[in-house]
């Protein structure tokens, strides 16, 4: 059986026609799934009994089961552990803002990138998620909170560009007016910096925001923090970013997790200013999430602000990320790992 969420409307139409069914039934089915959030074919009232049986025999609506749901004390952040049909568990985080609800979705079960500050990668990668499985996190979360989600961040477990085909199909699906109709400008894709895939993504000409996990302007330190830096130097990464900016005319966000005594010095801030000077970019400074498997400590607020001020003085737009959901392990990979380790 196949997950119907992996299908575009046109693909489902073609399948129905091949079974001597009416093509317009595909639109009716999509309406039930994406607008009414009905995930059982038998509850789709305007679908004939014969067609329901045909669909049930060949497809399932692959929305995951909620195995854990946590809500922060301020009620603005929800953390979900979702379980797929094969028993694999991933996590998603919903953040409520005045401008709308945002979800951070996972693209893989685990991750193989090995970034030292990330809990998602500690057990390696188990498998890629399909386009429909990524999409299903949004649908399951919408059903749980009873509200529409209008912004998507691909920044949960997994490296999106390490699952390129499924992630790009997800982008095509989620932005389609036949499914969730989320605007491309409301989507952010975060990557540790797989250079050839950044260029390939640029050639797709999406209007999404690309976020690069940078974390150091120096190759030696970046190699220590992020194994991907052993393959691609900062020079190569910046060349790929320039290609992306020139191709899409979209501003890039550089994520920079500040670790006390490691990458939060004035010297590092000045070097970062030099690396990014003149680029169409924005820097998001992040107090690092402390995990027991490493000795990384959060930089002090004073250091973070001083670091940011140097960037601003050099004409680089900079913000400090607001921490949300710290009381519910909302950082990437923390909740899933504590759950599966039991």
UniProtKB/Swiss-Prot annotation:
Query: Which amino acids does the record list as binding S-adenosyl-L-methionine?
Result: 158-159, 190, 213-215, 289
Which species is listed as the source?
A: Clostridium botulinum (strain Hall / ATCC 3502 / NCTC 13319 / Type A)
EC code: 2.1.1.192
Intrachain S-S bonds: 104-332
Q: Give any GO molecular function from the UniProt entry.
A: 4 iron, 4 sulfur cluster binding
Its required cofactor(s), as named, are: [4Fe-4S] cluster
- One biological process term in Gene Ontology: rRNA base methylation
Top-level lineage group: Bacteria
Positions binding [4Fe-4S] cluster in this chain are 111, 115, 118
This protein's name: Probable dual-specificity RNA methyltransferase RlmN
> Which Pfam families does this chain map to?
Radical_SAM, RlmN_N
From the UniProt record, report the name of the gene that encodes this protein.
rlmN
Source taxonomy lineage? Bacteria, Bacillati, Bacillota, Clostridia, Eubacteriales
Q: How is the cofactor bound?
A: Binds 1 [4Fe-4S] cluster. The cluster is coordinated with 3 cysteines and an exchangeable S-adenosyl-L-methionine.
